[in-house]
């Protein structure tokens, strides 16, 4: 198997200039497990630090836009859209990040970055109510971050 980002000269960013622009979409998901009481506080808008979901959406969108700055071999991609949405369970929030672009390379790393930062932002916003009496986080856990869909298609 030939490595695409490493050769005898060292590490490189893969050349994509010869590739055709195509519609690209990627959807990534992940979950944060929280205490049921914390979920209730988020739903009621009673987290002291502010609007948890709005902060997570803004942070996730900004992260998508900056993916090429934090993952060294990612290309800067002209994005056409980003959506961050939430589904609630009794003791978790599932975050979905959908990223769209018309470009030469895919957007799955952007979707993964967006969902990861949105989840981290939720943790940051609720840490005061998630800590136990020793200042630890025995219930809080980020899990199941994955790409659930990747699309590449020609558009006329």
From Swiss-Prot:
What's in the keyword line of the UniProt record?
Lyase, Molybdenum cofactor biosynthesis
Please give the pathway this protein is involved in. Cofactor biosynthesis; molybdopterin biosynthesis
Tell me which InterPro entries the record gives. Answer: Mo_CF_biosynth-C_arc, MoaC, MoaC_sf, MoCo_biosynth_MoaA/MoaC, Mopterin_CF_biosynth-C_dom
- Reaction it catalyzes: (8S)-3',8-cyclo-7,8-dihydroguanosine 5'-triphosphate = cyclic pyranopterin phosphate + diphosphate
Question: What class does this enzyme belong to in the EC scheme?
Answer: lyase
Entry's SUPFAM superfamilies? Answer: Molybdenum cofactor biosynthesis protein C, MoaC
Read off the Pfam families from this record: MoaC
Keyword Ribosomal protein attributed: no
Q: Where does substrate bind?
A: 73-75, 109-110
What residues make up the catalytic site?
Answer: 124
Q: Which Gene3D superfamilies match?
A: Molybdopterin cofactor biosynthesis C (MoaC) domain
Q: Which GO terms describe its biological process?
A: Mo-molybdopterin cofactor biosynthetic process
Describe the task this protein carries out: Catalyzes the conversion of (8S)-3',8-cyclo-7,8-dihydroguanosine 5'-triphosphate to cyclic pyranopterin monophosphate (cPMP).
- Alphabetized NCBIfam families for the sequence: moaC, PRK09364.1, PRK12343.1
- State the oligomer form and interacting partners: Homohexamer; trimer of dimers.
HAMAP family tied to this protein: MoaC_A (MF_01224_A)
Instruction: Kindly provide the name given to this protein in its UniProt entry.
Output: Probable cyclic pyranopterin monophosphate synthase
What is the species of this protein?
Pyrococcus furiosus (strain ATCC 43587 / DSM 3638 / JCM 8422 / Vc1)
